Amino acid sequence: LCPNVAILDPTLVTGLPRHITIGTGMDALTHAIESVVNPSGNPITVGLGLQAVRMIRDSLPRVVADGSDLCARQDMLVASTLGGLALGPGLGMAHCYAHTIGMLLGVHHGTGCGIALPAAMRFNREHASARLAEVARAMGVETAGMSGVEAADAAADAVEALMKAIGHPTRISEIVTQERILENFEQIVAGTMSDERTGDQLRLEHLP
């Protein structure tokens, strides 16, 4: 889909329910971070993605706390658009997982992305440490003195901290029963691995 116009009017989304605000916000953050670490990324997509990360870091907690905050809503709309513009190189494993559990378990797409994002970042940390270090700094982490892998881990930790601060689940078991997860486990793995976006992963050759 390639729209001709994007209407970024914060007054249109002030009534968005809190859980939708949280889920769509995490989807936007996932777009941004996956664009930054994608091996096919370029200076334009990386720059757009990092700016989106910075804006979401600052604005998402504000819109969750006060949905009528027009400045924060506006910043989230702009950040989401920047993340969309950065998607040219492709997405990543968090989206593969979200597509699958959305279909099999009915999990909101953005929520599925958010749950998978920190794990996907850690999975790729050795092969994307430099880009993930940039994400860490965009999330407000002071990375001076850290190794690349330490900075990558700090980026994932910062994302998890944001999720907890806004009331977003960090584990699928928080919103789906263990029984349903186990019943669908093989399909979840197969669906995630067969998603066309899995090819964007840096460590695909190391997957079991």
Which residues does each PLM region occupy?
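C-terminal charged capping/lid subdomain of soluble metabolic enzymes
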Residues: 132, 136-208
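A generic structural signal for short coil/turn motifs at secondary-structure boundaries
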Residues: 15-18, 86, 201
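Short runs of predominantly hydrophobic/aromatic residues within well-ordered alpha helices
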Residues: 22-25, 73, 113, 185
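Alpha-helical architecture
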Residues: 7, 25, 32, 93, ...
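Active-site segments that bind and position negatively charged phosphate/pyrophosphate groups
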Residues: 35-158
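A glycine/threonine-rich phosphate-anchoring loop and its flanking beta-alpha core
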Residues: 1-41, 131-138
